[in-house]
Curated annotation (Swiss-Prot):
One of its GO terms (cellular component) is membrane. It is an enzyme of class 2 (transferase). This is RING-H2 finger protein ATL54. The lineage of its organism: Eukaryota, Viridiplantae, Streptophyta, Embryophyta, Tracheophyta. Gene3D superfamilies: Zinc/RING finger domain, C3HC4 (zinc finger).
Amino acid sequence: MARKKHRKLFPTLASETNKTLDCSNGVCDPICPYNCYPEPDYYTISPQLPPWSSSPQPSPCPSPSISAVYLPSQDSSSSLDAISIITITGAVLAILLTGFFLVAKFFSDSVNRVNQGTYQSDNEDNDTVMEEEFQDREQVDHPIWLIRTTGLQQSIINSITICNYKRGDGLIERTDCPVCLNEFEEDESLRLLPKCNHAFHISCIDTWLSSHTNCPLCRAGIAMISVTTPRYSGPVEVTPGGSGSHLENDGVDEEDHGEIENRVDSDFKESDDSDIRIEIYRFDSDGDGSETETKERVRVLKECMDPNGGDSVNSLSHTKTHVESVDFPGKSCENQSEEFTRHNGEDEASCSEENGGGSNQLRRSCDSGELNGETTGDEGKSQSDISSSTLKTNGSSSSVSCFNKNKSSVFPL
């Protein structure tokens, strides 16, 4: 069988058959078989394997080049090194920041403790100084703003004069209100205090006077209250009986003794010897806060002698004594008491009984003398005139011979 001759695809290269190339280095040109071998198809077409042969052996793979193996391993190691460096750096920074915050907190706490100790020591020193000042000045424990004050009544506040402000008239010296410090306007209604002539806004001074009784600028008093001192000039009715006794005053003489307060108290008791003592206490308070106490005592002596032994004391169960106006200054009381003791024996009462025409009427009259005592003291001369009124008794219809002696006297303590 004739062998077919293939047509050459590269005629230009086929003419150069005498040129051989060395293909032993493993690098062959695609046209090498046609140039190097006379039958290139024999080398390019793989021969068919025989049927008895086993599985085909794999062709050995060419060894990888150095660049293909070395370059990927270098990239992975560099990435691992970068990650580890970043991790270590972050951990170091975290440790440093934590230590810095701990140190800063420790120093801040120590500084606060030092400042607190210094502040407490300063406060203790200030408290000690203030306590020493309070002890030196003898101040009270309670602050002044805790003291409750009582002001004037609204009727008294409304009675204070209201005037219109005229600039330059000379009535009001200030041009502003001392309470609110606002300027007075022309023809504005102001309240003018009576004593000091200080002017205020009506709302300002009314609020002040509701809790105070003086001027807020000069502390002068606002209201002048005149109080009269009672003087006992009428008859005083005395009924023996111990605790059941009572005192009646029919007439009162008025005399101005104080500006703020005048109080009169009375007390009386019956002693064992039938002497009734009436004590009158009078308290006069001046405007400056001082108080003067005056004590007066009225003693009524009852003595009745019944030679027949009859019960004539019952007829004197009701005795009325008239006490005239008696005034004893404070420092002359002791002298008056001594004067009364000295003249007590000289004061006698005469009692006479007259029965006219055998009538059953009994008339007793008692004339008492007058006790005039003149005493001299440090403050001056004091004189007391004491007179007793007629002793009126209601006896029985039968004639009873009774000698009664009644002495009425007033002397101070």
